[in-house]
Amino acid sequence: MAKGGNVRVTITLECTSCTQDSVNKKSPGISRYTTRKNRRNTPLRLELKKFCPYCYKHTIHGEIKK
């Protein structure tokens, strides 16, 4: 039997270099990915290396608040 409520949540990952560049107005946009994570296994904020089409390279994408 399953215990508790929803352990898996949908999160949004945002490019960290695009968000820093958007302050200086260098990048045309901000890359965002959606994924799911298990809150029990990864209680901290998730950071993954993903491809950013605005930076044209693989960068670190961090979890953001909704």
From Swiss-Prot:
It comes from the Eukaryota. InterPro entries: Ribosomal_bL33, Ribosomal_bL33_CS, Ribosomal_bL33_sf, Ribosomal_zn-bd. SUPFAM superfamilies: Zn-binding ribosomal proteins. One of its GO terms (cellular component) is ribosome. GO terms for molecular function: structural constituent of ribosome. It is found in: Plastid, Chloroplast. One of its GO terms (biological process) is translation. The keyword Iron-sulfur does not apply. Pfam families: Ribosomal_L33. Keywords: Chloroplast, Plastid, Ribonucleoprotein, Ribosomal protein. Its main location: plastid. HAMAP family: Ribosomal_bL33 (MF_00294). PANTHER family: 50S RIBOSOMAL PROTEIN L33, CHLOROPLASTIC (PTHR43168), LARGE RIBOSOMAL SUBUNIT PROTEIN BL33C (PTHR43168:SF2). Belongs to the bacterial ribosomal protein bL33 family. This is Large ribosomal subunit protein bL33c. It comes from Cryptomeria japonica.
